[in-house]
Regions:
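Conserved beta-strand in the GNAT
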Residues: 1-6, 74
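Acyl-donor-binding surface of acyltransferase catalytic domains
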Residues: 22-105
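STAS-typified acidic loop motif
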Residues: 4-29
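Short amphipathic alpha-helical segments, especially helix-boundary/capping motifs
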Residues: 9-11, 32-35, 84-86, 114-120
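Short amphipathic alpha-helix that is part of the acyltransferase structural core
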Residues: 15-23, 89-136
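Active-site rim helix/loop that mediates acceptor-substrate recognition in acyltransferases
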Residues: 55-57, 129-151
């Protein structure tokens, strides 16, 4: 089990958030203990990530008060082995990539994101938060990444 105090979510969501990543050796009782600890520390929003191959954890989440919200896939493509099918490659013609470095361009893009580009992530579909908070979260994530020199 790995617990992360998601301090960045205070700005994004307005709550003190924690993320708990479980592994195959964890149990519902261990999760309950960790949950009590972080609630005592001020947790207002808790995200629990479970491995897909652990039915004991997956099927206990609802009885612990959690709601299944999203599945995350991790995809890797070995570029040297990948050949794009012609049916997909045809959509790539005529596209261009433009780096936006001006502050006004970035603010315009952040505004587009805040208005609801993302509709199906766990924050946007949560009735407590909604699409506005979800958009704000992604815009802040992008802004922070660019400020740290990411691309």
């Amino acid at each position: 089990m790995k617990t992360t105090h998601a301090v960045w979510e205070r700005e994004n969501l307005g709550v003190d958030a924690y993320e708990i990543a479980l592994d195959a050796s964890d149990t519902p009782d261990l999760l309950r203990q960790e949950e009590r600890r972080i609630v005592a520390a001020g947790a207002e929003y808790i995200v629990v990530k479970t491995p897909v191959d652990c039915p004991a954890l997956l099927f206990s989440m609802q009885s612990l008060g959690y709601t299944y919200v999203e599945t995350v896939f991790h995809v890797m493509i070995r570029r040297d082995e990948y050949h794009m099918p012609a049916s997909i490659a045809r959509f790539d013609r005529g596209l261009s990539v433009v780096e936006r470095t001006e502050a006004a361009d970035r603010e315009r893009i952040y505004g587009l994101i805040r208005r609801g580009v993302f509709k199906s992530d766990r924050v946007s579909i949560d009735p407590f938060f909604g699409r506005e908070k979800g958009g704000n979260r992604y815009a802040n994530w992008l802004r922070g990444m660019l400020e740290r020199g990411g691309s």
